[in-house]
Swiss-Prot record:
Disulfide bonds: none annotated. It is a peripheral membrane protein. The lineage of its organism: Eukaryota, Metazoa, Chordata, Craniata, Vertebrata. GO terms for biological process: Golgi organization; intracellular protein transport; protein glycosylation; protein localization to Golgi apparatus; protein localization to organelle; protein stabilization; retrograde vesicle-mediated transport, Golgi to endoplasmic reticulum. This is Conserved oligomeric Golgi complex subunit 7. It comes from Bos taurus. It holds the Pfam family COG7.
Length: 770
């Protein structure tokens, strides 16, 4: 039987009994289940007895083992207590040993100090004796003229002197030793010069060793610099005596310096410990010792060029220098970790320093150059058509000059001259706007827009208007190119000079400005050639202004700036003047007719209608010639304004939207024409006509009954013309015609609600009691 299932967690009695019966003998299935059950019960009872016996035996063994475990625990406890006592005793022994040892060590330390002092005293006595011995032998040694032996003696004396610092005659010994070193240097100087001149590596190494041991390396390097500097200075003087232009002379000098750099680096690397520093100082000293000096050469070269070309010539010289600087930068780049950055910065200053005075006054030079260049762009010509054409051509010339100025600023100052550039550009734009304005005034005079001849015949001439439209298109091109140029200017300034802006800079904050200076000094250590900054030290005010410009561009974005806001406003005013010119050229003919109205004799002269009857119907009257001319002229306006609608000219469209027309719509009027520029112009001219017409009518001194009807007829005609063009007649014009048509006896009633001054004036003209 399988009794293991009794141990299962999911044991089920019924399932086990059923399984036992299924697994039983066949007799159980044949009906002898009772006997099989009795067998199972008997087996279970036997199994229970076995289990009880096993449990009893296990319990008995456990009871027997318990006293032994308790005895073991007690023994372990006693051993732990004994161990604790032993550890306390050991701890006390250690403490006692430490006390005894510290006293012994203190004695040993004192003994060692005494020993050290005695050794030092012994060494001092030995060195003093050695100094005396060497001093006595040095004269004999000098007679041998053996530099190595003399150097060894002097080195020994120098070492001895270091031990004699506290002796009374120490200073005298120092002076004596320096005098001996000077004698050695004087003795060796011819050989030193010969070694450096012939580029003898072995001899040069020997002298480096000797002079290093006697602490005279600066003096040895002075011989090196002098030997090679003489050769380079002679090459420069030879170049200066040629007929070559200065930029070619500079190129020759820089080629010689760069060649010397590469040759000397290769040689010095085998002789000196810090060859790059040595050759860097050689170039610095050479550039500073040139005769004639570079500042003098630049000054004379600029003066010879004259005011017209001084900036151009200066840039030619600067290009040669910048090319040399780039060559040096590339030569130094592979050995950046070996360089003394302070020396490299001194070299950068020596290379670019001669240009600093010109860079600081770059703005003035640029302004002068731009104005001279622009003086060759005349806008004024005899014929109007030539003026218009020159104005159109001048746009590209203006922005060509401006873009070239930006190129020069970046090329010559790396963006540090931005403030001067902006000033120069403002002067250029101011000069351009002034000349453009003068040309517009000249065109007005040629068309006699400000001096209307009243006695001239009425005739349509649209030439002036067409030319004015071309000028408006030119203004639009000016505004468009100005916006593009300003965007490009901001981007180029930020990309070029932005490297000088410190992250800690805060506008109008002294602390931020000082932090930015420190940060810039740190950043200059990265690459002095790229971070050269002449402005920060020599013109801090201008540098602060530049930082504010860069900060604004960076914070607000290069598209949201006001670098040329004054110039842009001036160009907008030019566009407004061009609009006024175009408007006046159209309105001139109308105004010419309207100004005749107050002076017409027909208003106070009795006509045929007066002699017949006052009750003639108004349709029997026809508009007078002056109003007929005006009406026909206005009706022809849409045809001549058509270019505004049909011409696809983005510049013209820009200018038209930027400009403002005179005689804006009255408040409360519907403005359907605003969506169409041609209708906008037509509306403005119509309003100008009606307002001027009203002003002219109110200046008529007297009206007869007949002329009153005639004037009302003329006004009705003009109103019909306006209706035909889809335009609203002005309220003033409607009020006047209403007052003119009113019968004398109804005048007071009709005038109610109308402006009192208007009603009084019309009543006076009609001689109506009011």
């Amino acid at each position: 039987m399988d009794f293991s299932k009794f141990l299962a967690e999911d044991f089920d009695v019924k399932e086990w009994i059923n399984a036992a019966f299924r697994a039983g003998p066949k007799e159980a299935a044949a009906g002898k289940a009772d006997s099989h059950a009795a067998t199972l019960v008997m087996k279970l009872q036997l199994f229970i007895q076995e289990v009880n016996h096993a449990v009893e035996e296990t319990s008995h063994q456990a009871l027997q083992n318990m006293p032994k475990v308790l005895r073991d625990v007690e023994a372990l406890k006693q051993e732990a207590s004994f161990l604790k006592e032993q550890m306390i005793l050991v701890k006390e022994d250690i403490k006692k040993f430490e006390q005894d040892t510290s006293q012994s060590m203190q004695v040993l330390v004192e003994i060692d100090q005494v020993k050290s002092r005695m050794q030092l005293a012994a060494e001092s006595l030995q060195e003093a004796d050695k100094w005396s011995t060497l001093s006595a032998d040095i004269e004999e040694t000098f007679k041998t003229q053996d530099i190595a032996v003399i150097s060894a003696k002097l080195t020994g004396m120098q070492n001895s002197l270091m031990m004699l610092v506290d002796t009374p005659d120490y200073s005298e010994k120092c002076v004596h030793l320096e005098a001996l070193k000077n004698r050695l240097e004087a003795l060796a100087s011819p050989q030193i010069v010969a070694a450096f001149t012939s580029q003898s590596i072995d001899q040069s190494k020997m002298f480096v060793k000797v002079f290093s041991e006697i602490d005279r390396m600066p003096q040895l390097l002075a011989y090196y610099y002098k030997c090679h500097k003489v050769q380079l200075l002679a090459a420069w003087q030879e170049l200066c005596q040629t007929d070559l232009p200065l930029d070619r002379q500079l190129t020759g000098l820089y080629d010689a310096l760069l060649g010397a750099w590469h040759a000397q680096i290769q040689w010095a690397s085998q002789v000196f410990k810090n060859p790059h520093d040595v050759v860097t100082v050689l170039l610095i000293q050479t550039l500073g010792a040139l005769v004639p000096s570079l500042p003098v050469c630049l000054s004379s070269g600029v003066e010879r060029a004259g005011p017209e070309l001084e900036l151009v010539k200066l840039l030619e010289f600067y290009d040669a220098t910048a090319h040399f600087a780039k060559g040096l930068e590339m030569a130094l780049l592979p050995h950046a970790y070996e360089q003394n950055l302070v020396k490299v910065m001194e070299l950068v200053d020596a290379v670019y320093g001669p240009y600093k005075p010109y860079q600081l006054k770059y703005g003035d030079m640029e302004e002068k150059y731009l104005l001279i260049q622009f003086s060759e762009v005349p806008l004024e010509h005899g014929e109007v058509i030539d003026c218009v054409q020159e104005l159109s051509h001048s746009v590209n010339k203006l922005f060509g000059l401006s873009s070239a100025a930006v190129d020069r600023c970046i090329r010559f100052t790396s963006g540090l001259g931005t403030c001067g550039l902006l000033t120069a550009l403002k002067s250029l734009f101011a000069k351009y706007v002034s000349d453009f304005t003068s040309t517009l005034h000249s065109i007005r005079k040629k068309y006699r827009l400000d001096d209307i001849p009243l006695n001239s015949l009425f005739q349509e001439d649209w030439t002036a208007f067409q030319n004015s439209i071309r000028i408006i298109a030119t203004c639009g091109e000016l505004l468009r190119q100005c916006g593009d140029f300003e965007q490009q200017l901001a981007n180029r300034i930020l990309s070029t000079a932005g490297k000088y802006l410190s992250d800690s800079f805060s506008p109008r904050s002294l602390t931020g400005f000082q932090d930015s200076i420190l940060t810039d000094k740190k950043s200059s250590a990265k690459n002095p050639w790229q971070e050269y900054n002449y402005l920060q030290k020599d013109s801090p005010a201008e540098y602060g202004s530049l930082m504010e410009i860069l900060y604004t561009l960076k914070e607000k974005g290069s598209s949201n700036h006001h670098l040329l806001s004054a110039s842009r406003s001036a160009l907008t005013r030019l566009n407004q003047q061009a609009h006024q010119l175009a408007f006046d050229s159209v309105f001139l003919r109308i105004k010419q007719q309207l100004l005749l109205i107050p002076k017409m004799d027909s208003w106070n002269t009795a006509g045929i209608g007066e002699t017949l009857t006052d009750d003639l119907p108004t349709f029997s009257l026809t508009p007078l010639e002056y109003i007929s001319n005006i009406g026909q002229y206005i009706m022809s306006l849409p045809l001549n304004l058509e270019p505004f609608v049909t011409q696809e000219d983005s510049a013209l469209e820009l200018a038209l939207h930027a400009g403002k027309l005179p005689f804006p719509p009255e408040q409360g009027d519907e403005l359907p024409e605003l969506d169409n520029m041609a209708d906008n112009w037509l509306g403005s001219i119509a309003r100008a006509t009606m307002q001027t017409y009203c002003d002219a009518i109110l200046q008529i001194p007297e009206l007869t009954p007949h002329s009153t009807k005639q004037l009302a007829t003329d006004i009705d005609y003009l109103i019909n013309v306006m209706d035909a063009l889809g335009l609203q007649p002005s309220r003033t014009l409607q009020n006047i015609v209403m007052l003119l048509k009113a019968k004398p006896e109804d005048y007071r009633q009709v005038s109610k609600g109308l402006p009192r001054r208007l009603a009084t004036t019309v009543a006076t003209m009609r001689s109506v009691d009011y």
